[in-house]
Structure formats: structure tokens, C-alpha cells
Amino acid sequence: MNKLIILLIAFFLFNNCSFNENSRIWKDKDKELLGEPNIKKVFVKKKSVVREFNQNLNLDLSGIKTNFKYMNNRNDFGSQSYKGELKKIGSYKFSKLDELNQINFKPLFIENDIVFFNKKGSIIRYDENQKILWEKNHYSKAEKKLQPKLDFIFYKDSILVSDSIAKYYSINANNGDLNWSKNNTYPFNSEIKKYKNKFFVIDYKNTLRCYKIKDGSECWNLPTEDSFTISNSKYSLVILDDMVVFNNSIGDITAVDIESGLIVWQLPTQSTSILNETYDFKTSKLVSDGSSIFFSNNKNEFYSIDIKTGTTNWISDINSNITPVITGNLIFTVSDEGYLYVIEKNKGNIIRVTDLFKNYKPKKRKNVYPIGFAIGNKNLYLTNSDGKLIVKDLQNASILKIEKVSSNIVSKPLIFKNNLYLVRSGSIIQYN
């Protein structure tokens, strides 16, 4: 009798708790699993609340050194000589550049002359009175339709050029005649840097290329990890001693021996998921004071890296893809939201934060972002996406002037020989 009772109980349990797909227990478990899908968001920006900080702090800029250099291999321009009258004194005109969402190329200054390009890739040299000295085009009819964007660097009596359609060449600076011309496999996406008899440039495949100035032949190339999408920002490089240090579309910082092209060190700053995110990932230019490299990105990271070892000195929570400026022991940068940060260079401490967009109404402010800035003497000159120029006294928290300088997109301010220049779609405007 007892055995019969045990068998009946066992049969009842197995009938209600079966292991088939219709079992209630397992159906509930499936619901629990289905309720937690394995979904991963790519490019999740950290959200941080930014507020003004230390507004009553006056900076001691009495020991600030004025820099007269327009170009250098460290991108370290510091404070430049400019009094800031902001009176328009000249306009260098050229055919408008189409399909622009940013102006991240700049003119070449040779003594008192300016060299730039138009929408068909013609290179133009102007004198100090805005008169054209010569204009030359070294592109075929088909290439002109691609509207190449050019980057320049000056070397002795030559101008070295790299462009957005994979050409690089050298021309005579005095008349624009072609010295030599070559093609790369992929378009270029960086500024040009030169060192002794070589020059360096990065292409869209994240490859650093070294060429000989004499004839354009390749010395070596160093490919780094590629991304799945095309970057929307320009890459950057600096040269210090016997090393070239550059970034790429996925946030890697790589130091390379100039002579051999071998890697000295490499620092990944982003996770592997960045491979799918590079169109939205933006970073500033690299800037160096000789011992460290500084840069920031739009993922709330401002880095200081040791130049010799590639180790991280510090990281600050700042959201910016604008090139920082170093003056003495201070670093200045502007966040994507329009806040001016003053940072202690050696430790990364933020010592003051000022809202430069406070005069914008909230609705308007959402659609405005900073383009770039320069420091002239003790003032900051910032251009915005709405064509306005903001002038800020760096010693205190006061905004000196807000001026409309363009009806559409404009470049960051460029200071050369006590004048300020702004590149627009069809002209370069000069201010004293």
C-alpha cells in the first residue's frame, strides 16, 4: 500500500513539473531570459553637468611669453602677439568652397604673402595688398570636379601639398610651377609636418607616411588599426627630437622613430567598440610642451601623456575636440558646450570654468558650438558655428566683445604678424 502511494505521488510531480518545452517552470524562466535582451549601445557619451567655477579667481599672467611663430612641429603656439583692435583691413577672395561642414584647413603665410586654394584646387599666392601674384592648377578635369581640399607646408623655395583625393606634390613657391607629383592609395586626412629632408602625413586608412622632400619617394609607412567608418575629424601629429607622435580615428596615440619608422610606444585611449563609432568620435589636435602631449576628445576626456614613455600623467573630465593652448603652467581649452577651462598643466587640476555662451538664449545655445580659438597677448578669441567671434579677457571672467564676423561657417582665428585672419567659404578676412 505504501509503495502504491509513493508511485502515485511521484507520477503527480513529474506530470506537473515536466522537462518538456511546455513546462510552466521553464516557460517562466524563458520569459525572464527574454525580458533581458543582450543589447549594447555603441558610442554612449558620458553626460556631465558643467557649471561655472572659481569666477572670482584672477589669473596672474604677468609672466606670459608672447610667441611669434605661426607654425611649429609641436603645435604649441601659446600666446601670440595681437593687440586686438578687430578692424577689418583686407579680404583675400577666391571661388567658394562647396560642401563644407567645417573649415579645418588654413592658409600658408610666406613673409608678407598668403597662399591658399579655391574649389577646383587652384593654388593662389597673394601679396600683402591682396593682389594675386600667381595662380596655378595641377589637377585634371576629372580631379577638379572632386573639389580637392589642400594642406600646405613651406620648405625653402618649395611648397609641399597633400590633398583630400590622394595626391601629394611639390611646387615652386615663387611661380607655382610643379616640381614633382605623386599619388597615394588613399586620401590624406591630416596636416603636414616636415623634419630635415622628410615630411609626414596621415591618410584615411590610419597610416602614417614618410616621404622625401626632394622627389616625394616614400621612406617608410606605418599602418595602425583601421576603423569600419570614415572619421569626421582630421588627424594630428607632432614631431619631437627623433620621434613622430600621431593619433588616428580610433583614439590610438603612437610614437614612431623618425629614421626607422618603428613604433617606440603606443597608447590606446578607447575601447574596441570605437571601431564602429569613428564618425562620431572627435579629438583635438595633439599639442606638446616638449615633455608631455596634451589632447582631448568629445567623450569627456582630456589627456596628458608622457612623451618618452607614453604613460598617462592625468585625465580630466572635459568634453572638447578643440585644440588646447598652453601658456606657462596653464592650459586653456573650450568645451563643446561653450565653457572656458583653465587647467593646471602639471597635475590636471581645473582651477577655473567660465561660461562663454551665457549671452545666448537657451534655444539658440543648443544649436551653437565652438570652432576654435587663439590667444592674443592676454585675450582669448573664439569663433563659433553661428559666425560670431567672442573676445574674452583671460585674467578675469569678463567678456570684452561679441562680434558677427560671418553669416555662415568660419575657421578658427589665426594670428600672424600682429594681424588676425579668419577663413570663410570664399575669402580670408584680415583684421588688425
What are these regions (language model features)?
Residues 63-64, 89-108, 132-156, 178-196, ...:
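Extracytoplasmic beta-rich repeat domains
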Residues 111, 118-119, 127, 156, ...:
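Structural signature of WD-repeat beta-propellers
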Residues 127-131, 172-176, 212-216, 258-261, ...:
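Short loop/turn segments that connect beta-strands within beta-propeller blades
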Residues 124, 169, 209, 254, ...:
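WD40 beta-propeller blade core
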Residues 2-8:
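Sec-dependent signal peptide recognition
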Residues 40-59, 82-100, 137:
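A short helix->beta-strand "capping" segment at the edge of beta-propeller domains
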Residues 11-46:
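Bacterial Sec signal peptide processing site at the extreme N-terminus
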Residues 333-343, 349, 353-392:
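Loop/turn-rich, solvent-exposed surfaces of beta-rich toroidal or solenoidal domains
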